[in-house]
Amino acid sequence: MENEIFTPLLEQFMTSPLVTWVKTFGPLAAGNGTNLDEYVALVDGVFLNQVMLQINPKSESQRVNKKVNNDASLRIHNLSILVKQIKFYYQETLQQLIMMPLPDILIIGKNPFSEQGTEEVKKLLLLLLGCAVQCQKKEEFIEKIQGLDFDTKAAVAAHIQEVTHNQENVFDLQWMEVTDMSQEDIEPLLKNMVSHLRRLIDERDEHSETIVELSEERDGVHFLPHASSSAQSPCGSPGMKRTESRQHLSVELADAKAKIRRLRQELEEKTEQLLDCKQELEQIEVELKRLQQENMNLLSDARSARMYRDELDALREKAVRVDKLESELSRYKERLHDIEFYKARVEELKEDNQVLLETKTMLEDQLEGTRARSDKLHELEKENLQLKAKLHDMEMERDMDRKKIEELMEENMTLEMAQKQSMDESLHLGWELEQISRTSELAEAPQKSLGHEVNELTSSKLLKLEMENQSLTKTVEELRSTADSAAGSTSKILKVEKENQRLNKKVEILENEIIQEKQSLQNCQNLSKDLMKEKAQLEKTIETLRENSERQIKILEQENEHLNQTVSSLRQRSQISAEARVKDIEKENKILHESIKETCGKLSKIEFEKRQMKKELELYKEKGERAEELENELNHLGKENELLQKKITNLKITCEKLETLEQENSELERENRKFKKTLDSFKNLTFQLESLEKENSQLDEENLELRRSVESLKCASMRMAQLQLENKELESEKEQLRKGLELMRASFKKTERLEVSYQGLDTENQRLQKALENSNKKIQQLESELQDLEMENQTLQKSLEELKISSKRLEQLEKENKSLEQETSQLEKDKKQLEKENKRLRQQAEIKDTTLEENNVKIGNLEKENKTLFKEINVYKESCVRLKELEKENKELVKRATIDIKTLVTLREDLVSEKLKTQQMNNDLEKLTHELEKIGLNKERLLHDEQSTDDSRYKLLESKLESTLKKSLEIKEEKIAALEARLEESTNYNQQLRHELKTVKKNYEALKQRQDEERMVQSSIPVSGEDDKWGRESQEATRELLKVKDRLIEVERNNATLQAEKQALKTQLKQLETQNNNLQAQILALQRQTVSLQEQNTTLQTQNAKLQVENSTLNSQSTSLMNQNAQLLIQQSSLENENESIMKEREDLKSLYDALIKDHEKLELLHERQASEYESLISKHGTLKSAHKNLEVEHKDLEDRYNQLLKQKGQLEDLEKMIKTEQEKMLLESKNHEVVASEYKKLCGENDRLNYTYSQLLKETEILQMDHKNLKSVLNNSKLEQTRLEAEFSKLKEQYQQLDITSTKLNNQCELLSQLKGNLEEENRHLLDQIQTLMLQNRTLLEQNMESKDLFHVEQRQYIDKLNELRRQKEKLEEKIMDQYKFYDPSPPRRRGNWITLKMRKLIKSKKDINRERQKSLTLTPTRSDSSEGFLQLPHQDSQDSSSVGSNSLEDGQTLGTKKSSMVALKRLPFLRNRPKDKDKMKACYRRSMSMNDLVQSMVLAGGQWTGSTENLEVPDDISTGKRRKELGAMAFSTTAINFSTVNSSAAFRSKQLVNNKDTTSFEDISPQGISDDSSTGSRVHASRPASLDSGRTSTSNSNNNASLHEVKAGAVNIQSRPQSHSSGDFSLLHDHETWSSSGSSPIQYLKRQTRSSPMLQHKISETIESRAHHKMKAGSPGSEVVTLQQFLEESNKLTSIQLKSSSQENLLDEVMKSLSVSSDFLGKDKPVSCTLARSVSGKTPGDFYDRRTTKPEFLRTGPQKTEDAYTISSAGKPTPSTQGKIKLVKETSVSRQSKDSNPYATLPRASSVISTAEGTTRRTSIHDFLSKDSRLPVSVDSSPPTAGSSSTTASNVNKVQESRNSKSRSREQQSS
């Protein structure tokens, strides 16, 4: 079955054009292979790879498997190599991207015998065709394609267009390199790019989905067992199962992960508990060992005490010594404290020194910065002045431009007036000329003269240009208004908002940091106070326990170290918290930056849409069609207008910049005022500082007073240290014990201790003095730093006050942030308290970890879903699904939806009514336009402006309506998106709150468990002194639990409120979605209505066209128009009101959208802050863990110490019993001691006061130090910001300088363009002057034609005699030519380039000699007969004028059109006016034709030069060959100039030149570059000969030999001005030929029309036919006297057939021989035959040319060269030639032909040029039938010099021939007289 289906497909495929094209590369299958074999060969890829190698031989050859044997893998390998090569070739060499889907190799490899396989092979072949057509060998492949059938050719051409031109298949990347592309070209490219992007994205999504499905299938194969078919449910699809299983697996995975985490947490907790238990066990064991040892020691001590009671006295003496040692120890301790103070002081001094150095460097940097700023200020002032001057100059230039425009308008008016006058004059002249030419019998209708036509053309051009100028001025004004309103405002607002937001963020960051640092400082101060109190208590305990002093000292040192560690840890915590907050702030900044970027992107999108709308409006506006003749000029004017528009835009930009600078200056002034206010506030601060200084001085005075009091109380200060220690350190009981002990000791020791304490007080006083001095110094430093900070704060406050404008928007956000921060701070405090007391808070943290990770995963998923939702919102598919689900859930919202639907229905009706109104307005406007057109064709110009204004208003209304609709839709879409986002965020937030609730509940449960455990422990442990403490802790825990409960209740309330908000948002979302759907339905309905209304509009337009014919009266139309205008005005007002209401609605929606965006941003910030706080809490939790462990260790140590102290307490109680007995003894001494104690109390009070003041001073110094550090950090941050701002300022300055440079460049360009415009206007004036001179020449030529009437018959007889002489000379010339051929070496046609170049060099040398001798022989020209005086006499001045007319033709290509039109008019004059029937009329026509032919002669010669110049220009590769070709071209033209200068051959020469110019049209088409380069290159080389050519022609028209010589010299003098003039004629002739060839009627038909009008012409033509028939019998021998026209044509046909048969290997000699034999056949005949011969030869060449082009591409230029050969051959029949010189000329032409044929740059000619040349041969017979009677004798201007061998013979022959000619001409003149 498959074979039966595939065989017809295979036959169709193998007969397809692509396969037939591929077969041109070679046979697909060996031998007579079937279609299947050929198809298999194609599919295997071996043959196609070979084809690709032929196309791209440079490609890297990869190994292709030639023996596939139906192996799919090998086939795929081969085809993949092919596809890679094709792709590489397109991308690298052709610079194109393949946009069509590449051929599927898998389908071709695995299933080639199918429809899909054939289609993929077709794609492959298509891509191969594209490569072949665009490769280097494309000419060969195109020739092969042209050899195919016509149908296949057409199909292949269509395929080529698909590959090359269709941008959907292949995208061209070369436009990227093009810099200057118009917007019209860029728009389709952008549209294509967008469509391609969409397609690529769709394909990418499809492929990604398929990849996911495949991977899932693979995973299912790996993991799932092969399920039986019964297990599968019949209803459920496998795709649904996959998705369900996937979801199920993901849920299970998440649960498993959560379980793993929980298990890990439990494991870690249990390990920690294990470790704690181990530590406790070890501690218990250590304590047991210690207690055992103490017990043993106590037992041994008891025994020893009993033994050593007698040694107590000795021990008491030792105790006395110990007391002394302790006193010494205390002194040393105090000194140790002093050492530590000194160390701290040294470090402080070092830090102060470093700070001073840093401040010094910073001040120096600031100095440099201020200097740079001052310099920059000067520069900015200068630049400001310069800009003002520039602005003034620009205003002056604008005024000047306006004046110039007004002057130009006035000049245009004057030119129009002058043009009208010239038109009237030309009409008058034409009328006079026609009256002269007319006879009295027939007076036909007058025809338009040349001047009239020129004037009409110029007037039409001027009118069109005026219209365009008006339209351009309107567009310029519109652009100004739009650019001023839109561009400036949007750009300024964006920049200001960005800068304000950035600076606001910085200010907020700095403020937050300052607040945080202040808080940390306060915490540190509180901690330091607590530590000081603890230190005091510890010192008291040390002094009470002097016996265990050594142990206590060690313990205190350890405690001090531990406290230092705690302080450092607290500081680290504060720093870490500060850093975390900084990071949070940075994250918030990043989020804000991203939101700003998003808003900027949205704004750019809106601007882009605006631009697109503007472009569409412009495209709709540009409906006018421009004329083909004026396209070039209009484009030029368009460019000028664009340049002017650029200038205008640049000026606008500069004006806007100036405005912005002025605004900035005003803002800076305002800021300066604000800064002055801030300076006043800082001055107040300085006053406060001064007050502080005064307080310090007062403190100094108090210290001095204290010193005096200390000196007065020296005697009583001996006992001060004991009481001080007792008052500070001990409780009441300990103080009494201490007093007893000290009373027991000697009073002498007390005095010593008092002395020691006195010394300590002295040292403390000195220290206080030093501290005060340091504080004074620091205050001075701080003052200096404050001044610096004030300066910097001024700079910072400038930026702050700039940001205050933008900070108003962010105040709401700040308030919310502060509230959130307060909440977070409360939460942090609660968490810290919980973490200090509870170990089980780890679970909470870890649960939070899991929840956070899950939330992050969910957030990532939700973000992805958001992106997909944003993409799919345009399609509204998911929104519909959501709507259905939400409708099921919420049926209550149906009522609200119905209300909304009603409102939407009303809105829809309003919209429909508005649309109907607008359509009515359109219909009315169209009616108005039709009626206005019908009213009067004469009043079109008057009403044109009104119509244009109405159209513009109508378009504006339409555009406004469309824009409002689009904007409303966009706003609603954005609202929906924002609400959806807000909903999602609220859901996320609710989930987070739920998770937090769960965690709090878990914590609550854990706390309850712990409380229960603690209660159990308390009940089990026996009651001791610690019970009170545990009770307190449990009470605190219960309080905290109550707090947590309150917090939970608050959180639940918040949750409930958030859920309510969520429900409200859901309802809002549903409403908006319903509105959106309704709006979509409305839009679709409106679109349908617009389509139907457009159709109705078209029908109405047709009806209007019919009704316009019926409308007759103007009065009824005017009344209807007035009524309609009134209606339109009413409608317009209503539309404007509606538009205002719509705009208000749009603004409300915008405000709503902004509020939603703000809410969204707030929620994002909250989420990120919570995440960051969570991270910081985790880190803090870790640190708290470590701290908790340390505290446990310390707690154990303290417990040990406590036990020791209890033991000591027991010992002390024993001692107290002993002391009580001793106290009774000491009561007497105590009475004496009380007096001392009272004094001591006074001193203690004073000492306490001093200590208090000292502590206050210390606190103040610490506060100042912290403030100083804070200020330092602020200073550093501000300096960093300052450096960054300076860098930004430098960047902006550089950008400003670059913009300045660009503006100056653009100004220079504008000036240059204005100069060019002036030059062009001058050239236009010059061309008008030239046209006037041509008109004058036309008059003179017509007058000369009238004078030449009488000489016609005389010259006819002279020509007959001349022909007889030429017949005799023919045989002599043939013999001489044959003699020359003996010495001539045959040259190969090609492949012997070196031999040709050698011959060329020889010929160039000989040519120089020929030129020298030729100049000598110019003086030997014989005189003409007296009867030919005044015939065709052109004055010398006129010839110069004609040359000057064309002098500027190549300088400005724009004037060619006018030139062409004028020359066409000149050429058609004789044919338009040849209508008289009598002989007199016939003669007049002949005179006109002769005069016009003489006028055209100069242009014909210029065309010859043009061909040479183009040929020379087309060979740019080699300089030497180019020079040789130029010289050869000059030689060829010199021969034509010499040999065709006679009056006899003037007509023939004209015909030949015309044919030659027709041949050159093909080269003009091929190489258009030659036009511009001809004046610079080709004309210089040929400067000498064309001038002599023209002068020779003028000399033949004169009677005297002297006159001819005089004019030759004049032509030679005017070499520099003339060469460029010849090129101008070429275009006029070409234009004429192209018009004739393009028209349907041939020139022969035209001639027939002319002959119908004139019977004389019919009679003449019949006579010529009879004479040809009569002369057929005599055409056998070459010596026969008369040759008929038919015989000559047959001979020319034979010559063409011979040239067609000649191959590329023929010698050039044979061709020259054949052409010379033909020329010898017609030289002896009469004049008309010679003319036709020249025509037939020149007309033959295109055919030959075409034939040679098909065989070899190297011989593409044979056509024009053979025309030159024809010139030289026809000139061989003149009476006075030297034959050897003629043969040399033949050699030169042949060599030049070879050199030109070898040009590799030649390309194919156009078909139009070939056809026109073929028609040109038949067209000119009509002119030369009139010239058959011309019998004027020829005059030889130049005789070519002889060679070295036969110079004397040739000179004698020349002289004899000239003498015989002169004598014959004189005898005939006598006879005629």
From Swiss-Prot:
Record note on disruption phenotype: CCDC88A knockout mice display mesial-temporal lobe epilepsy and early demise, and structural brain developmental defects affecting the corpus callosum and cerebrum.
Membrane-topology descriptor: Peripheral membrane protein
Biased composition (Low complexity): 1839-1852
Short sequence motif named GBA, residue ranges: 1674-1704
Region of interest: Phosphoinositide-binding: 1390-1408
Record's subcellular location: Cell membrane; Cytoplasm, Cytosol; Cytoplasmic vesicle; Cell projection, Lamellipodium
Example of a GO MF term: GDP-dissociation inhibitor activity
RNA-binding listed as a keyword: no
Residues with the Phosphoserine modification: S233, S237, S449, S1020, S1387, S1417, S1677, S1692, S1719, S1822, S1839
Database matches in InterPro entries: CH_dom, CH_dom_sf, HOOK_N
GO biological process per UniProt: cell migration; cytoskeleton-dependent intracellular transport; lamellipodium assembly; maintenance of protein location in plasma membrane; membrane organization; nervous system development; positive regulation of cilium assembly; positive regulation of epidermal growth factor receptor signaling pathway
Residue positions, PTM Phosphotyrosine: Y1767, Y1801
Residue numbers spanned by region SH2-like: 1715-1825
Modified residue annotations for Phosphothreonine: T1421
Matches recorded under Pfam families: HOOK_N (PF19047)
Region Disordered, residue ranges: 816-841, 1013-1034, 1407-1459, 1560-1602, 1616-1643, 1738-1873
Gene3D superfamilies from the UniProt entry: Calponin-like domain
Protein known as: Girdin
Protein species of origin: Mus musculus
